[in-house]
Amino acid sequence: QAIVEGKRSELVQSIWQAQEFRPDGLKSATDYRSDITIDEAASAITWPYSQLNEILRGLHRETLTTIAAGSGLGKSTFCKELIHHLLMHDQKVGVIALEESNKRTLLGLTGIHLSKNLLVEREQATDEEVLEGFDDLFGDRTCYLLDHFGSSDIDMICQRIRFMAVSLSISHVILDHISILVSAQEGDERRMLDAACTKLRTLCSELGISIIMVSHLKRPDGRGHEDGARVSL
């Protein structure tokens, strides 16, 4: 057709300047040459606990970390300690706490900053002390929380996480907890959990963020996990 239309030079040029075609997702090993010497362990943010750092060698980007334990054993408290630790190390944090109000989350974080358990004994600090601690913790640090009530759809949660990472430069997202996202939906809970985790893990790699995800353990027959039941993985 090009020859018929007198476009012989354009045809020759298109042949000699043709670019290599490669389907999406296929890369040559040489494409990773500049990445191979990067020490991911050396660039990782630490956990607030030394034993975790020894085992996990830090908190890495592009990872999905699951926190699992029985009811009432401190999963949410652990997450608050982690959030405070990340903020104190100048990390930008996103919080999606689906089981409690943002006010309670922020009061708990302020209490950690003041070394007081304000969620149990609010009278440990005056209103002025609480506000002073709040301003000292959040005044020049980045922490965004999802106003979530009425919102328990995994696709919506993924959209908000994407916005946090792209538009707000969030590096770490704490999701507490994944179980509530699938409990309100109909269908095979195991399949929905697998699908939700796949979407979250994909976001970690795509956006270069870490997601710390809390999960309840399925209650076995007899004793619960909080009473010493063994965990089956």
What are the residue ranges of the model-derived segments?
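The Walker A/P-loop phosphate-binding site
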Residues: W16-K116, D135, C143
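Catalytic P-loop NTPase motifs of RecA-like helicase/translocase cores
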Residues: L181-V182, P220
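Cytosolic-facing regulatory segments adjacent to core modules
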Residues: E54, H89-S169, S183
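Conserved ATPase-coupling elements of RecA-like P-loop NTPase cores
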Residues: V182-E189
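Phosphate-binding/switch region of NTP-binding enzymes
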Residues: N53, G108, R191-L233
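Conserved Walker B
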Residues: I178
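Accessory, often N-terminal, substrate/partner-engagement and coupling regions
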Residues: Q1-F21
